Amino acid sequence: MSEDLSMKCGLEIHVQVDTNSKLFCQCPTNYKDVEPNTNICPVCIGHPGAKPMPPNKKAIDMAIMVAKMLGCEMVIDKDIYFQRKHYNYPDLPSGYQKTSVPIGEHGKFLGVGITEVHLEEDPGQYKPDLGTVDYNRSGTPLIEIVTDPDMKSPEEAREFLRQLLRLFRYIGNLRGEGTMRADTNISIKYNGIQGNRVEVKNVNSIRGVYKVLKYELIRQKNVLRRGGEIKLETRAFMESQMITKGMRSKETADDYRYIPDPDLQPIVLSNEWVEKVEAQMPETPMNKEKRFVEQYGIKEDDAKVLVSDLELADVFEKVVAELGNDKDGISLAVTWIRNELKRVLVYNKLEFFETNLKPEHMVELINSIKDKTISQKIGKTIIEQMVEYKGEKTPKELINEMGLTVIEDTSELEKACEEAIKNSDKAIEDYKSGNQRALNSVVGQVMKLTRGRAEPATVVEILKKKIDG
């Protein structure tokens, strides 16, 4: 019997704004490299009578930018007030979280509806196993992005988050994966039976969201298949086991007892304010991909790979400009940045910014290949060494240290070719019988004997002269 199974998924994504001070006080937002409970004050630990400052303007500007880049309609000339969202948990010292009403609404990103974008304060960090709370994080500005339940598979949700985090890197001033947290909302329909919505709280990675949705899809299907009922509930993600466990029945808005915060004046966004933020907005990854294809004439797949890493895309443009911005320069930049450099980065699990390489390093390497100082094979070795040394050594320094310049002495090349011919009887026989490709095996032998320092075209020329007589 075939199964009729479908799912709906929506996400609530929380991303920290990289500000110097917290949302409602002047305490630093650094909470990772300091002793617990040192970057705190009466405001961020909820002392009675402590009054918050007006919200951090940079945090508001970043929320506006995120909302605009997600295609939201901005809430203009209306009161955007902060509410008190009440719940009891050790990481929330005041007993409520200050969270704004929407700043932007009704957006769309990658075909997924964006319900709203708003600002709120991050709670502290509670460690139940130790019974300790660190309030250094309490009050750090958070932007929350709430999506419509438009995602139909774990894979779609994973790709949505990947592209969203890429957008955050382009925007800047946002702390991405590692500090991002997502609440997943999932419901399924199985053989005509509709299950209730289940929320899984505080999943802190793209991989985690994917695993949660895969697990819940199977768990909920099995419950319905056995004739059970999916509870409307909130569940916790047990990351070490990659499973979810029930926490409590799902809250409603009434359970949080929202009230306007009497200590904070409403924000009123004007068209001028939004336009000023818009003027500072960067090019989106999607627009950059399109421009790369149109401006440089490169393939869509190449543009997608380059744009996936903001720094890599910037290096590509700078290298192309240095190489003359012509067809040959573009082709070389694609080969050595999109293909070779990206290969080495993926192998070493690095982003470009972690290598300390500069555009001029890539220009120097490519020029060394263009002017035949080194062969393409050696170029691949040098790029691996450049990444390994984290930019401490230039391509020329590495070439000289390793003695990898192209062999220009014809007699040395001829000796290597003669030795390769002696050891390649079968390939020579096949070549003489008309199999031109058999010569590649002999060329490979020469490259091995010369440690890649021979120019392949020169080797082919010498081999043909010696074999053909």
UniProtKB/Swiss-Prot annotation:
Role played = Allows the formation of correctly charged Asn-tRNA(Asn) or Gln-tRNA(Gln) through the transamidation of misacylated Asp-tRNA(Asn) or Glu-tRNA(Gln) in organisms which lack either or both of asparaginyl-tRNA or glutaminyl-tRNA synthetases. The reaction takes place in the presence of glutamine and ATP through an activated phospho-Asp-tRNA(Asn) or phospho-Glu-tRNA(Gln).
Q: Which PROSITE patterns match?
A: GATB (PS01234)
Record key words, sorted: ATP-binding, Ligase, Nucleotide-binding, Protein biosynthesis
Q: Name one Pfam family in it.
A: GatB_N
Catalytic activity reported = L-glutamyl-tRNA(Gln) + L-glutamine + ATP + H2O = L-glutaminyl-tRNA(Gln) + L-glutamate + ADP + phosphate + H(+); L-aspartyl-tRNA(Asn) + L-glutamine + ATP + H2O = L-asparaginyl-tRNA(Asn) + L-glutamate + ADP + phosphate + 2 H(+)
Task: Indicate what this protein is called per its UniProt record.
Answer: Aspartyl/glutamyl-tRNA(Asn/Gln) amidotransferase subunit B
Q: Which SUPFAM superfamilies match?
A: GatB/YqeY motif, Glutamine synthetase/guanido kinase
What NCBIfam families does this protein's entry cite? Answer: gatB, PRK05477.1-2, PRK05477.1-4
Quaternary context: Heterotrimer of A, B and C subunits.
What InterPro entries would the database entry show? Answer: Asn/Gln-tRNA_amidoTrfase_suB/E, Asn/Gln-tRNA_Trfase_suB/E_cat, Asn/Gln_amidotransferase, Asn/Gln_tRNA_amidoTrase-B-like, GatB, GatB_C_1, GatB_Yqey_C_2, Gln-tRNA_amidoTrfase_suB_CS
Q: Which residues form the signal peptide?
A: none
E.C. number, please? 6.3.5.-
> What GO annotations for molecular function exist for this entry?
asparaginyl-tRNA synthase (glutamine-hydrolyzing) activity; ATP binding; glutaminyl-tRNA synthase (glutamine-hydrolyzing) activity
Organism name: Methanococcus maripaludis (strain C6 / ATCC BAA-1332)
UniProt record similarity statement: Belongs to the GatB/GatE family. GatB subfamily.
Tell me the GO BP annotations in alphabetical order.
glutaminyl-tRNAGln biosynthesis via transamidation; translation
Gene for this protein?
gatB
The record, for PANTHER family, names:
GLUTAMYL-TRNA GLN AMIDOTRANSFERASE SUBUNIT B MITOCHONDRIAL AND PROKARYOTIC PET112-RELATED, GLUTAMYL-TRNA(GLN) AMIDOTRANSFERASE SUBUNIT B, MITOCHONDRIAL
